[in-house]
Amino acid sequence: MVEWTDDERAIINGIFSNLDYEEIGRKSLCRCLIVYPWTQRYFGGFGNLYNAETILCNPLIAAHGTKILHGLDRALKNMDDIKNTYAELSLLHSDKLHVDPDNFRLLADCLTVVIAAKMGAAFTVDTQVAWQKFLAVVVSALGRQYH
């Protein structure tokens, strides 16, 4: 079990309290699909992903990005039990969707870039430490079924 300090909890809650889920979710998923084009293979049913412009304008990608952030919100509300919170989602991604678990880390990295850009100077070293810890726990929980 991961131990969270009061400061870490406050930082992570602070990040989420200022997030525009639609904007940040869309930008993060789009960035992941553009920067790491091999991740597009999991989104074959989302229509044309031919180039960066079509990805950025794709409403299904935008909606899924928002859905991902709402999924992270579940981790926020269950910080002391993220592993069990994501047990079902881990099963879905491993057994049904066959998602390479490394892609969770790639998306987490893209999310960090987008949030850091949005927060600017407020994304301090301490903020990044807490945020990276949170995402590492989420990524581990999502990849749990693969172990």
Curated annotation (Swiss-Prot):
Disulphide linkage map: none
Alphabetized GO MF terms: haptoglobin binding; heme binding; metal ion binding; organic acid binding; oxygen binding; oxygen carrier activity; peroxidase activity
Residue numbers binding heme b: H64, H93
The keyword Iron appears for this protein: yes
Gene Ontology BP, a term: hydrogen peroxide catabolic process
Keywords: Heme, Iron, Metal-binding, Oxygen transport, Transport
Distribution of this protein across tissues and organs: Red blood cells.
Keyword Heme assigned: yes
Ranges of residues in domain Globin: 3-147
Gene Ontology cellular component list: blood microparticle; haptoglobin-hemoglobin complex; hemoglobin complex
Subunit structure: Heterotetramer of two alpha chains and two beta chains.
PANTHER family, A to Z: HEMOGLOBIN FAMILY MEMBER, HEMOGLOBIN SUBUNIT EPSILON
Function: Involved in oxygen transport from gills to the various peripheral tissues.
Family: Belongs to the globin family.
Designated name of the protein: Hemoglobin subunit beta
Gene: hbb
